[in-house]
Curated annotation (Swiss-Prot):
GO terms for molecular function: enzyme activator activity; single-stranded DNA binding. PANTHER family: SINGLE-STRANDED DNA-BINDING PROTEIN. Keywords: DNA-binding. The keyword Iron-sulfur does not apply. Homotetramer. Gene3D superfamilies: Nucleic acid-binding proteins. The lineage of its organism: Bacteria, Pseudomonadati, Bacteroidota, Bacteroidia, Bacteroidales. One of its GO terms (biological process) is DNA replication. InterPro entries: NA-bd_OB-fold, Primosome_PriB/ssb, ssDNA-bd. This is Single-stranded DNA-binding protein. One of its GO terms (cellular component) is nucleoid.
Length: 161
């Protein structure tokens, strides 16, 4: 058994290029940047920030969504597979390119953050919004009964941190 699964959260480096074919299928390509923060080791050594650029490929329905809603600077959550292909350049040298073929995408940028204020988001993002709204409400509902209980019975006091 083997697993080929990639999960990325990053920023779109340039507006996607989308090609539509006579068959009705579409392919979108764009670069995505992921950045590891810089930090300082205990001995004072500075580790600089590091940015990786990933070649992203989306096809069919995802390519259409990318065409309509994804722009340079947008923050995306992507799931997909990594693939490497090769080709010969003009001088005959063999070149290799590694790409991420997207299976799932979630837009993390707020509506209208980078382009056209009020631009509609794809349905996948709209489906996420109600879940995000419910999550803050659940802890509030749980917190109300625990406030009514005596402090010694509060399970939050038993936390190890």
């Amino acid at each position: 058994m083997s697993v080929n699964k990639v999960i990325l959260i990053g920023n779109v480096g340039q507006d996607p290029r989308v090609k539509y074919f006579d068959t009705g299928s579409a392919v979108a390509t764009f670069p995505l940047a992921t950045t590891d923060r810089g930090y300082t080791l205990a001995n004072g050594t500075q580790i600089p920030e590091r940015t990786e650029w990933h070649n992203i490929v989306a096809s069919n329905r995802l390519a259409e969504i990318v065409d309509k809603y994804v722009h340079k600077g947008d923050k995306l959550y992507l799931e997909g597979k990594i693939r490497t292909r090769s080709y010969s350049d003009q001088s005959g040298a063999m070149r290799y390119i590694t790409e991420i073929f997207v299976d799932n995408m979630e837009m993390l940028s707020p509506k209208g953050a980078n382009t056209g204020a009020g631009a509609p988001q794809p349905s996948a993002t709209q489906a996420q919004q109600p879940q995000q709204m419910q999550q803050p409400q659940q802890p509030q509902q749980q917190a109300q009964p625990s406030q009514a209980q005596p402090i010694q019975d509060n399970p939050a006091d038993d936390l190890p941190f």
